């Protein structure tokens, strides 16, 4: 039940603050990418993701890396920096106010975020390749982490 912080790097890699922070954000999205791989195997496809929560407070950064991890465009609205309680409140409002046959996606698109300003980032081939390389190393490093537990 105790966490073990683990930072691994290759001897030939450059240890810099930028690379360290990128690794932190990539790691935050690595488990999501693994889950999305399972969904792909089940023939579930994503068209776009909406980024919401504290990780998106700084515009563009986590959004760009999430787009690379998911392989789909990511839109962040003006309210993207609001976190979990905001999302829970939206789910509660949906349960209370939804119309017959109205999906959560429809409710959010037409009644909550209609007219909200946002930015969409499409994953670049270079970012996708960079994340794929990270994810391959991440999967390998999971064995080392398991050995420590």
Task: Identify the role of each PLM range.
Residues 1-149:
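Glycine/Thr-rich phosphate-binding loops that ligate phosphate moieties of nucleotide
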């Amino acid at each position: 039940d105790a966490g073990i912080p683990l930072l691994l790097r290759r001897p030939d890699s450059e240890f810099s603050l930028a690379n360290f922070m990128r690794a932190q954000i990539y790691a935050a999205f690595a488990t999501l990418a693994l889950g999305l791989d399972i969904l792909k195997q089940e023939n579930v496809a994503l068209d776009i993701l909406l980024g919401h929560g504290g990780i998106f407070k700084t515009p563009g950064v986590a959004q760009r890396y999430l787009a690379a991890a998911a392989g789909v465009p990511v839109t962040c609205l003006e309210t993207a920096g609001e976190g979990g309680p905001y999302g829970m409140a939206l789910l509660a409002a949906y349960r209370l106010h939804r119309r017959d046959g109205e999906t959560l996606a429809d409710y959010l698109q037409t009644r909550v975020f209609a007219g909200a300003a946002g930015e969409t980032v499409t994953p670049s081939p270079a970012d996708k390749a960079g994340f794929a390389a990270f994810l391959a190393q991440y999967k390998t490093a999971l064995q080392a982490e398991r050995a420590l537990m």
